Design a protein with these regions (language model features):
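Pocket-lining segment of extracytoplasmic ligand-binding domains
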Residues: 29-122
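Ligand-binding cleft/hinge of the Venus flytrap
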Residues: 1-23, 36, 52-59, 121, ...
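Predominant activation on well-ordered alpha-helical scaffold segments within soluble catalytic domains
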Residues: 5, 51, 157-161
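Secondary-structure end/capping motifs
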Residues: 91-166
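A general structural signal for well-ordered secondary-structure junctions
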Residues: 14, 40-41, 59-60, 118, ...
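Conserved C-terminal helix/tail region of periplasmic/extracytoplasmic solute-binding proteins
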Residues: 157-184
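Short linear loop/turn motifs
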Residues: 19-22, 136-143, 175-184
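A local structural motif
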Residues: 9-25, 29-32, 39, 169-178
Length: 184
């Protein structure tokens, strides 16, 4: 909701006056609503659900990529939709193991992006996406990246600021302090 509102407002569209947005809690609800609405319907779906919907709904096209649209209107942040979180106490008590985990995590991301066919098999085997061919098609569009340190802090803090500006409760009522960002 906040991401869509931000992008719309930055493009001169008032989401409360210029259009009607109907939010759904499940991607399957969105796909069903698209099918019921017919031609001209518009939806926002994350990957891999957009790829799944395209396999079910003939003529369904991606006309806007939220990451690309975010980058057009925001120069001081990135659209961050997934992060790794750990308690400070845990990291302090297990620093070497945590650093090793981060290296493995980064390698895993690089492997997934370089080996989409093999990664898709794993994604399907673990039930993340129903079928490997669907996962293989969706993975390149998932924008799976590894960012850490000062770069991560800059990207994430800018994103959190956008959320905070719309609704402070979206980030727990206050912007996180510098100690929130590991290795920054």
């Amino acid at each position: 909701e906040y991401v869509l509102n931000y992008i719309l407002k930055k493009n001169g569209i008032d989401p409360e006056k210029d259009l009607t947005v109907e939010y759904k809690s499940e991607a399957t609800e969105v796909a069903a609503a698209l099918q019921a609405a017919g031609e001209g319907a518009i939806a926002v779906l994350p990957q891999p659900y957009v790829t799944a919907a395209q396999s079910q709904i003939e003529g369904l096209n991606v006309v806007l990529n939220l990451t690309e649209e975010w980058n057009k209107v925001s120069t001081d942040s990135d659209l961050v939709t997934g992060v790794l979180v750990a308690r400070t106490e845990f990291i302090e008590q297990n620093e070497a193991a945590f650093e090793e985990f981060l290296k493995d995590y980064q390698s895993s991301i690089e492997w997934v992006n370089s080996n989409t066919a093999d990664a898709a098999e794993l994604v399907a085997n673990y039930g993340i996406v129903a079928k490997a061919p669907l996962a293989q098609k969706a993975l390149p569009a998932c924008n799976i990246t590894y960012v850490d340190g000062a770069e991560m802090k800059a990207k994430l803090s800018g994103y959190l600021q956008v959320l905070f500006d719309q609704n402070p409760k979206a980030v727990g009522g206050a912007m996180p302090g510098d100690d929130f960002y590991y290795g920054a």
